[in-house]
């Protein structure tokens, strides 16, 4: 579509029903502020210019809305005098002369580009106003879209509707597109002669028709038009978002054994033929390649799992974790800023932080990379095909050469050459009969305490 477009996103509400110390549009859905989801939808509709109408937490909202490729102009709404007044807070941006003006809301994070594109197409086809509506089997409380001969003749609010009009199930979402060349003139004609003394954007339908303009409506899925005002509604939106994204991934070839227990982030990438077991949580920045297996109760954030690698169960991958092809991070392991080479194994009860592990190496149970001295982080480097015995502590900075062996229970503080065996533990001593003496002494002490009372 060659037409220019400005999206006006209304995000200046006081968010009183959210009962929060911050604006509701800053609350996350799938690990991302809901306002950013709205900007992403706008960008997907081919719109690169946004007038963001802000009020509460203006700077934070503008920052959260910033995504690559979209120019954001923040417009402060000092008073809350209705939706029509809110759009006019972006007067200067609108006056720049766009073909289309698209009005949407910062608290509707499930919207996608489809209805937005359809509304813009309606303008291209000659409409002056295009309202986005949705069909619902629960229309009570919504304004009804009344259509005749293909044109929208009115938006009838519930309190003003006749019994016949209340049977209409096509409802107003609040989103609309406006002919950019006529937008300012139409918006400035909105009056406030109503009980609340506010300026309502919906009045544009009547105004445009009174001037001989054409007004139409397009449809959107009800779920996409779900707004968020309370914590309960936020939970519903999160559920809807997760269900939609899980379904998309499964259709793309990802296996989820119990999808309702898997939680994704806005940018989670999972390749074809990956297997995700129950109760897995993906934080932002997780990339799972094809054929990888994520076992149950794992948490992955800011990490990359390569083809054929396995994670978990009960594993945690933190930012900077990078697992090579066919590698393994097993149960009760944590990896942070660590690269696990191809085919390397970190099977259980291990912490790998600020480390590089070469291909084919084996890290025994209970191994710890001691990467922090209380002030600075240091790196541990383990070569290829090395063997780290169980319950070893590798005190960084330290390098273990290719093919080296570390004996179980060792504390390694110095570099170990390739193919060397390193032992860093006290020599075992055996004292025959000593256990019996110790046991007798302990029992005597216990009896003496009991006798005293």
UniProtKB/Swiss-Prot annotation:
GO terms for biological process: cell morphogenesis; cell wall organization; lipid A biosynthetic process; peptidoglycan biosynthetic process; regulation of cell shape; UDP-N-acetylglucosamine biosynthetic process. Transmembrane segments: none annotated. The keyword Cell wall biogenesis/degradation applies. Acetyl-CoA binds at residues 365, 371-372, 390, 408, 425. Residues 1-231 are annotated as: Pyrophosphorylase. One of its GO terms (molecular function) is glucosamine-1-phosphate N-acetyltransferase activity. The active site is at 348 (proton acceptor). It comes from the Bacteria. Its EC number is 2.7.7.23, 2.3.1.157. Pathway: Nucleotide-sugar biosynthesis; UDP-N-acetyl-alpha-D-glucosamine biosynthesis; N-acetyl-alpha-D-glucosamine 1-phosphate from alpha-D-glucosamine 6-phosphate (route II): step 2/2; Nucleotide-sugar biosynthesis; UDP-N-acetyl-alpha-D-glucosamine biosynthesis; UDP-N-acetyl-alpha-D-glucosamine from N-acetyl-alpha-D-glucosamine 1-phosphate: step 1/1; Bacterial outer membrane biogenesis; LPS lipid A biosynthesis. It catalyses: alpha-D-glucosamine 1-phosphate + acetyl-CoA = N-acetyl-alpha-D-glucosamine 1-phosphate + CoA + H(+); N-acetyl-alpha-D-glucosamine 1-phosphate + UTP + H(+) = UDP-N-acetyl-alpha-D-glucosamine + diphosphate. In the N-terminal section; belongs to the N-acetylglucosamine-1-phosphate uridyltransferase family. In the C-terminal section; belongs to the transferase hexapeptide repeat family. This is Bifunctional protein GlmU. It comes from Rhizobium leguminosarum bv. trifolii (strain WSM2304).
